[in-house]
Amino acid sequence: MRPTALGFIGVALFATGLGSYFAFLPQSAGAVAFWVFAGGPALVLSAFAAAWASREELLREWFTPKWGDFTRGVVGTALLFCLAWAFVHLVAPIGSKREIWLVTLYGQIGDPHLLQAHAPAIAATIAAVATAEEIVWRGAVTSFLAERVGSRTAWAWAAGLYALSYVPTAWSLRAVGPEGGWNPMLPIAALGGGLVWGGMARVFGRLPPSIVAHALFDWAVIMMFPLWGVR
């Protein structure tokens, strides 16, 4: 693997981990800072990733649209949502000790009524960050890893690193009190999402289907069909 590729992966891990840690600290709950820390690193990294992909003549290949991309994205969203719903209801159901994982996570995102009042801005933010994350993780990072492990498994390795970048949130989202402790919800969600979106990028050879699936899933679990509480 080239030093520049290894360096980019390291920076992506560090920047995403640092941003996600601060995004999910209690003082960022429901504030603009949450969205800045959560999405800012991906937006910055995606600019460098896109510039590299353009020089390597990969950007056009990644974003060439094809008929049915949106439908593929919807199917991917439905699959991931079903997996997330099943996981939550099996591992952290309402009334269980692990419900606190979801309580702290959704509490961090903010007041549902305030989110609904700013729905267009939230939608634009989700779309931009989802696109940026796909460029970084399913695009650049996967391509860099393919140089080392081959294209057949690079997408799975990228999903693992994507999940690793969210491990710091296990500390920032930890709950206090007798039911407290580390909160693994986001690393688990990132692993599941990374595998689904990475698999889509691998199968279809492009990013639009995974971008649609990523953005729609985030919109669904935040704004339309939350996995905990009422939005």
Where are each of the predicted segments found?
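Juxtamembrane "helix-exit" motif on the non-cytosolic side of transmembrane helices
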Residues: G19-S28, L90-V91, P168-A175
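Membrane-interface helix-boundary motifs at transmembrane edges
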Residues: Q27-A31, L58-G68, T142-G150, A201
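Transmembrane helix-loop-helix hairpins at the membrane interface
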Residues: Q116-R231
